[in-house]
């Protein structure tokens, strides 16, 4: 933050034309014997209380030194070439004004943000009448750390006991201990190159070097896997037993809208901002679109609870060194489900079912979660037994982070972590109970007494983002390989579920007939018709993790059978119809998509 102090005999201002979409009310004003504080908010500045108190203390001290009877906080963008985004600058200036007002006994005024303004100033001209300052957020780090210490952690067990994390016995709870080490004691865990990155290359999950850092591209194999998970996310949402509406919307929103701007401030510099005729942000989840849509619905208490799901292309400006393929991205796809409930009591009841489904789905991968519950202190005091019940349902301790004296739009924010093959906790699924955004966006319903109410909203990603769910799948494969097992993708998620390999050209027609039969049953099947040896074709299919490799030669053709090599299993003969039935049973309850590649391998260009 850069500041210019002018001790003025008199100072007045008059707003003229708007300069920004984000702006205050156009109020004129004047002051005499004033310390005028011209403020440029820079990138990296934040509305942190400790930082603003440090700035305000200097402002007030300077006013006292020069004998000013009033202070004017004046937003002024011309002291820096590295300005913060308008929504951040407006908030910082507004909060600085409030902090100065609380510290100074005289008159404190603020000129409006977001306008071209005419002003008149008569500087007193004494040695201290013109001063400049540069303030950096890190100068307030001691006070900031003191504020952070107000957050504290407890371990809550299924029997309702509460423990200091430093004194808890973690015997037999290695994954939970890893979570506590990371979250409470801030210790870096694991190291080395994760094995799953090797797997991603074969399926076409890659960085896009011609885009921004943290943006991916998806080859055909990766694309079908992504879309299958998107389809499955909707199926899982419907399994909650409440009405679910699937929608689609835009990814850009105007910062001039109060609801958008106030919600966006929570993300600060992590936002993607698009400079156009108006300032736009790229959404970081589906919240904006779903809330903007539902505010226009006429909702009765009889409709509640219900959910909205969108596969939201989401954008978060992660630091370049933090991006990790498939796990931490700047652009990703979020199957974001928002559940609208009558009140906090109903929201908590719905989360019991939600919690069950979240654990059910990770269990299908042979994994489980360790959980971090972020709660406001008031919620913890008032609903501790609810958290104990969730711990009972998990059957193991949970880590609770308690945030005293702080106001959030949520009262509970739960993070569900797997522990990866390197021993690191990795957040996948989540849910939170939101008590603030319905009012912020104007979402209302009419209750039994014909009174207008604001619903309580549950935010959840049951599977996590599409990419993080797939990360969990591939990390499971890495754990399998580490244990000496053959990695095998779930058949429903395998880009190619069966590959038919003819022993010779003479068997190609029969191979195609087998492929036709399997494809008619909704099975993704391709045919290796290349001029390669049988052993190489089989090796290539195994390298591609095809779960069912079918070999057909003259003998199989004469018998009307196929020879099946099952990944991680044995080899056997079967009728093509029998194999189709087996695969159909295996993928029952999961979505189907066709093959996203040419059936014949000879028609596919090779990839580097």
Swiss-Prot record:
Which chemical reaction does it catalyze?
tRNA(Thr) + L-threonine + ATP = L-threonyl-tRNA(Thr) + AMP + diphosphate + H(+)
Q: In the UniProt entry, what is the domain comment? A: The N-terminal domain is an archaea-specific tRNA-editing domain that hydrolyzes incorrectly charged L-seryl-tRNA(Thr). Catalysis of tRNA editing is performed by the charged tRNA itself.
Which Pfam family, giving just one, matches this sequence? tRNA-Thr_ED
- The answer to keyword Magnesium applying to this record is no
* Stretches for region Catalytic: 194-490, 195-490
Question: What UniProt keywords are attached to this protein's entry?
Answer: Aminoacyl-tRNA synthetase, ATP-binding, Cytoplasm, Ligase, Metal-binding, Nucleotide-binding, Protein biosynthesis, RNA-binding, tRNA-binding, Zinc
What's the name of the protein?
A: Threonine--tRNA ligase
* Principal EC category: ligase
The alphabetized list of GO BP terms reads: threonyl-tRNA aminoacylation
What remark does the entry make about the cofactor?
Binds 1 zinc ion per subunit.
Write out the ranges of the annotated region (Editing domain): 1-143
Question: Which Gene Ontology terms of cellular component type are present?
Answer: cytoplasm
Q: Where in the cell is it found?
A: Cytoplasm
Tell me the cofactors it needs: Zn(2+)
Residue positions binding Zn(2+): 287, 338, 459
Could you read off the lineage of the organism from its UniProt record?
Archaea, Thermoproteota, Thermoprotei, Thermoproteales, Thermoproteaceae
Gene name, per UniProt, is thrS
What's one GO MF term for it? tRNA binding
Family stated for the protein in its record:
Belongs to the class-II aminoacyl-tRNA synthetase family.
Query: What is this protein for, i.e. what is its function?
Result: Catalyzes the attachment of threonine to tRNA(Thr) in a two-step reaction: L-threonine is first activated by ATP to form Thr-AMP and then transferred to the acceptor end of tRNA(Thr). Also edits incorrectly charged L-seryl-tRNA(Thr).
Subunit relationships: Homodimer.
Is ATP-binding given among the entry's keywords? Answer: yes
